[in-house]
Amino acid sequence: MKKILIITFIFYITCAPVNNISNHSKDELIFKSDSLMSAFPNDSDLLQSIISAKIEFARHNDDISIYKEILIIDPKNPIALYHALMNAGFNYHKKDYKNGQWDAIESFSKAATYIDTLGEPYYWIGQAYEKKDEMDFELPLESYNKSLELYLNQEMREKVILSKQKLLNRKKTYKDFWK
């Protein structure tokens, strides 16, 4: 009986820090992440909790800097990499020169590899192809079709369908003009 009590006591003591960590609120995990990671450097559960809390915070606040913080903690985090690459792609896409569009296409393509079930990167690839060369119909069309095969929220799906329809109308206009 004494052995069981001792084993139970040892088990309780060794589990106590984990329970204390798990009781931290998400805000504490986000804003005290540096000190928590310093205090518990080998706690992978704590690290994952901090990353999850930061991802949720970044999503709700649309804050790219939080994704960059996550990449410092976990350089291979696919969600943070996806958002960082999409942000880079948006910045390149805003530029008016062709090399900017090629850089945007590259960033969006890389983002698509990190979360391969989302169609949004393919929509933006199509937009970049259209901006790069308004006479290129096949590459944007291929990108829009790929986008529609994957997950899109309703608003983005409507945007893709509208862009695809405008592209097809423009393609028909050019084709009819050159008959």
Where are these regions (language model features)?
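A conserved position within tetratricopeptide repeats
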Residues: 33-44, 58, 71, 75, ...
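Alpha-solenoid repeat scaffolds
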Residues: 43, 77-78, 95-99, 135-136, ...
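TPR alpha-solenoid repeat register
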Residues: 46, 80, 121, 156-160
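Alpha-helical adaptor scaffolds
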Residues: 52-59, 67-68, 72-121, 128-131
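N-terminal leader/linker segments that initiate helical-solenoid repeat arrays
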Residues: 15-61
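Terminal, low-structured helical/coil segments at or just beyond the last alpha-helical repeat
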Residues: 141-179
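Sec-dependent N-terminal signal peptides
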Residues: 3-13
